[in-house]
């Protein structure tokens, strides 16, 4: 039996996935996707990431969990999208394996959109994710852009978890305690291995305060941005190649524990893009959604995150300021 970790196995899964997805692309182009789905119902498409999940081609009547009618699903997707787009059902996400194919840990429907785009609909939470912008990219990405996947414990962390990161994970539901831990450990940095983007090779997460920025001219702008942050939450770090290289994104946690990346390229505060549901998921998925490469769709239309969003955190004062007097008299709980 071939080792699942070998390059040949990875290439084989990619080639098979791409072949099946190309058939889907042709069916969409010919406006015959419904016929394709009827003929291929039961076909499983396995991706390289994660290996434990697959796409099962299925008609609506054979989805193994309760859904809505086709018209109701289309209406739901239209509400979730920031612009009108025709979506056609492909099937659902399931666990890989013949014996567990009908086990759906997350009730997720997969749709084919216009211009080769693919979407995942979290049916329970009514949240729509853009999985990929092209057929080839979907074969490469798999479900990397789908939040619930990162709640599974079999998804490895992208950096070594030490006592500080573990304490932050334990405090991710308490922004006050989380910010205090960041304050105490400001200046620490962690290399996060990138399993997806190859432009920079690695990304570095810093637990950084404005006071800890290097005294270099390139950092003056970033200091000004940090000082005037209008976002409701706590800036917990920044991302870049090295400690001396000016950062391209601030990382922020809001009151709900969600992690956002705030673009700092250009002449002002840029896009605010949701990166992860919580800090632990962020350490597993990295910044696959950063740098204007991802759209996040939320059920509340007023908080849609897109390439040029109306950030839901504007016009609200920061929860913690640089001058806040943290109580450092007692040690953190274990």
Swiss-Prot record:
Coiled coil: none annotated. It holds the Pfam family US22. Isoform 1 is not glycosylated. InterPro entries: US22-like. It comes from the Viruses. Keywords: Activator, Transcription, Transcription regulation. The keyword Endoplasmic reticulum does not apply. Isoform 3 can transactivate the human immunodeficiency virus type 1 promoter. Belongs to the herpesviridae US22 family. This is Protein U17/U16. It comes from Human herpesvirus 6A (strain GS). The gene is U17/U16.
